[in-house]
Structures are given as C-alpha cells and as structure tokens.
Amino acid sequence: MLVHAYSAMDRSEVLNGAASGGRLSQLSSLNQGPYSSAPPLCHTPASDFQPPYFPPPYPQPPLSYSQSQESGYPHLGDPYSSINSIHHQHQQPSWHTPRSRPEEAGLLSQTHRGLSLDPRRDYGGMSRLIPGLTDGGHSLADSSLSIHALSHHSLEDMQLLDESGISILDQSVIKKVPISSKNNSSMMSALSMNKESLIGGVSNPNEVFCSVPGRLSLLSSTSKYKVTVGEVQRRLSPPECLNASLLGGVLRRAKSKNGGRCLRERLEKIGLNLPAGRRKAANVTLLTSLVEGEAVHLARDFGYVCETEFPAKAAAEYLCRQHSDPTELHARKNMLLATKQICKEFADLLAQDRSPLGNSRPSLILEPGVQSCLTHFSLITHGFGGPAICAALTAFQNYLLESLKGMDKIFMSSTGNGHSAAESKSEKDIKHRK
C-alpha cells in the first residue's frame, strides 16, 4: 500500500506539472547529479495516464549563441543546457568557449556566415608566425578573426576572401603566409626579383654552406671547393630549379632513405625552402654536376691551355698557303683586319660580364637587358660558359694575328721579288746597249 501511494503521488505531480505548461524544468536536477537515484517503477497501470514527451536524442544543427534562446520564451532557460554541456565535453574537448559572452557570440556568427570559417577555430595565434605583422603592429589577434587559438590547425586550412583585407602568397618555393593588404605591395615587389627561390630572412649569401670534393681532379690531387649559401640559392632558382635529388648530387651527399628530408630541413635553417616533389626546369648536362668553384677552375685551365698550346701559327701558315694568289692578298688582309676588330668587340663585351659567381657581387657595367641574358648563360653553365668562350676567342685572335703576320711576309716577299727582277732587267738592257 505504501508503494502504490507513493507512485500515485508521483504520477499526480507529473500530471500537474505537465498541465501547468512548464517547459520541463525538472531537468535542472541534472546539474546536481546526472545519475541520481530514481524511485522504484512498480505501480498500477492507469488508462488516463499520459507520460511526458521527451524528444529523441537525434543530432540537431548547432545554433549560434545569439539564437540559443527562443524568442517566444525569453523568461525560460535552455532545458537541455546541462545535457549539451555534457555532450560537448565528451565529443569536442577543444571547445571551451562559455555561453555567457555575448560579444564573441555575435562575432562568431558573423565570421562563420561571412568567411565560411570553422567557428571553433581561432587564428589569433598566427600573428607570432608572421614577422611582418608583428613588426608593423598589424596582428590578426586584433582583427575580426581573434576567437580562440588552436595550434594544431595549419595555415593552409584558411579560406580567406579579399573583403577581409588578407591575401595568401602561393608559390612553389615560398611558404604560404598570410599578409595584410597594407604590406602586399612591398612584399610582392621584393618577391618578384627572386622567383620561387628566396624567402624573407635568408642568411648571409657569402656564408659557407658546405665543402664539396671535386669530380674532375685526380686521386693524388683531390681538392675541395667551398659552396656558399648564395650558390645553393642560385641552384634552386631559375633557370635550373634543381630538386632535392639533383641538388644532393651536386653537393655530393650520399643517398639515404631520409636524405631529401634532411637536406630540406638544413635548407630551411638558412632560409631556403625546397618543396618535395619539385620538377627541374632545365635539362641536365655534365656541367650541372659541377659546383661553381670547380667550373671556374676548369674554365681557367681551359683558357691556359688555349693560350699556350693551341697551334695558332701552324693553322695560320697552312691557310695562308691555300690563299697565296697575289690578286687576293689585299682583299684577304682586309677581311682579316675586319674579323679581328669584330672579335675584339665581342671579347670586350664578355669581359664586362658581371654575373654573380661564388661570393662575389660586382657592380653592373652593361645594360640590364644584356646582363640578364649573360647571367642566364652563366647560371646554366655554373660559371664555366663565359670564361670558356673568352678562352676560345683568345685562341681565335691568336690565329688572326698569325694570319696577318703570314700575309705581311707574303707581301714583303712579293715586293722583294719585283725589285730584283727590275734590277736584273735594267742591267741586261745596259749590256745590250754596249
């Protein structure tokens, strides 16, 4: 009898509460204990009993904080506040934003609808990753994106629009860093000079990156060449744009499982970024495997051999004998003089080449248009091309000089033979008269 009386009282209270129009205020007891003891469910069935309706726990779309309360019931609280708090605590441990902050609530709804950003993310912590923003005083922590920072989200997940005044530089070698619109012009002008090779903050170009043994030297006289940071930067820049595999071959790095990653990490320490999976831009030649020091050494030795050992005199004498016709001697001499002048002009042009090589940064002499073409050729040949052509021109000029000397000898011999023949003829005439 006591059990039936208690259950009847419980049913009457439930029916009275349901008839009074309350919005399930009994659920506030969940804040005290989610697993409180319940009375025994032993009661007599009643035909007029209507149990209260509880909505099923299906997933509902999240509402913004400004819409968390219904407009028709401003005086009532959220009946599922405790349940939602428990659900978010287990499902989304990184969501710790309280509901009692109306300022951030309105900001979150505007940012979520306008920029299609995840409302649980906050990019205010990225200002420390951008040196340009911290220096200029323009940080994302003061902008409309400052909500709550989550450091495990990457910068590439951002979807920024032009209306927010923020843009992202997308190049293969330059890391994607958001910059403010005020600094766009200055940074873009600096990046346009060095395409997809240089990152702001590159260390001293004259600093030695590593020492590389030569490929062309004998085992008895092996020499090492110092590779500077500037040379590594030139190998990563156009026109070659070497990848990690080719650059490792140039630097004589042994192949290993993580060799490319180790090389990229070392390059990042000096401010250079070598992306994985990069494709080379130029064809690979034998000169690609040479560092600039060895290429210049090869060009210098080639120039020495051309100047001292090239058979310029023998070649000139042979060709002069091929063209010994007295009627062509004058015209041929004029052609040799004109060719010598043209060759001298071209050699003087190459002597004014100021392409970057090693740790030297000479001042420019030629016009930028001509110098850029010569620099392109020098970068492709790692500094061997220009000195090698000058050495070949030196050998050709020596041939021209020997040819002119041979022409002068022919002229002298021809004029000498003419004088002797005239003298003998005059002597014969005198004897005949006698």
Swiss-Prot record:
User: What is the top-level taxon of the source organism?
Assistant: Eukaryota
Family, according to the entry, reads as follows: Belongs to the AP-2 family.
Cite the record's Basic and acidic residues compositional bias ranges. 422-434
- Which stretches of sequence are listed as region H-S-H (helix-span-helix), dimerization? 278-408
Q: Which residues form the signal peptide?
A: none
Give the Gene Ontology MF terms in alphabetical order. Answer: DNA-binding transcription activator activity, RNA polymerase II-specific; RNA polymerase II transcription regulatory region sequence-specific DNA binding
Keyword entries, A-Z: Activator, DNA-binding, Nucleus, Transcription, Transcription regulation
For bias type Pro residues, the affected ranges are 52-62
Oligomer and partners: Binds DNA as a dimer. Can form homodimers or heterodimers with other AP-2 family members.
Biased segments, Polar residues type: 81-97
Gene name on record? tfap2e
Task: List the GO cellular component terms.
Answer: nucleus
| A Pfam family this chain is assigned to | TF_AP-2
- Annotated region (Disordered) at 30-123, 415-434
Against PANTHER family, the record matches this protein to: TRANSCRIPTION FACTOR AP-2, TRANSCRIPTION FACTOR AP-2-EPSILON
Q: Tell me the function of this protein.
A: Sequence-specific DNA-binding protein that interacts with inducible viral and cellular enhancer elements to regulate transcription of selected genes. AP-2 factors bind to the consensus sequence 5'-GCCNNNGGC-3' and activate genes involved in a large spectrum of important biological functions.
**Where in this protein would one find the motif PPxY motif, according to its record?**
53-58
Per the UniProt entry, what are the Gene Ontology biological process annotations, in alphabetical order?
Answer: positive regulation of transcription by RNA polymerase II; regulation of cell population proliferation
Q: Where in the cell is it found?
A: Nucleus
Per the UniProt record, the source organism is: Xenopus laevis (African clawed frog)
The record's section on InterPro entries has: TF_AP2 (IPR004979), TF_AP2_C (IPR013854)
Protein name per Swiss-Prot or TrEMBL: Transcription factor AP-2-epsilon
